[in-house]
A protein has these predicted regions:
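Structural alpha/beta surface segment adjacent to cysteine/selenocysteine redox centers
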Residues: 1-53, 85-88, 120-123
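C-terminal cap of thioredoxin/glutaredoxin-like
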Residues: 46-123
Length: 123
């Protein structure tokens, strides 16, 4: 959920570009470790590309993905879905039973027991 401003939206796109090469979580860790202040410009294209380079991604593929805004609509749709589900802060988790469509929201840093209870209630 890109709520930290313009930097977050482009960073979210970059994670999907990394995922094209099987490196979503590796890229996510780098973003988390090197994130800057909200709207400070920390997630500009050059910096995001340097993170990809450090993961030994195919840079031609990554650059094309990021430069073409391949995942712009996906990021916008995720933001719209999160907003419609009542997410307005991080962390917010929307747990969905894909068979029934029922969902529950968990807001804030919660202990495992809250997640366990929520998931079990949706089964």
């Amino acid at each position: 959920y890109p709520i930290l401003g313009t930097d977050s939206a482009l960073a979210a796109e970059a994670t999907y570009c990394a995922d094209d090469q099987g490196k979503y979580w590796d890229y996510h860790v780098i973003l988390y470790d090197y994130q800057g202040h909200m709207n400070s410009g920390w997630a500009n294209a050059d910096r995001l590309k340097s993170f990809a380079f450090n993961l030994d991604l195919n840079m031609d593929e990554f650059d094309e993905c990021l430069d073409s805004s391949k995942y712009d609509e996906r990021v916008k749709l995720n933001w719209q879905k999160a907003s419609a589900g009542g997410a307005n802060s991080t962390p917010t988790f929307i747990i969905v039973n894909t068979e029934t469509g029922n969902e529950e929201k968990i807001v804030g840093a919660q202990p495992y027991s809250v997640f366990e209870k929520t998931i079990n209630s949706l089964l």
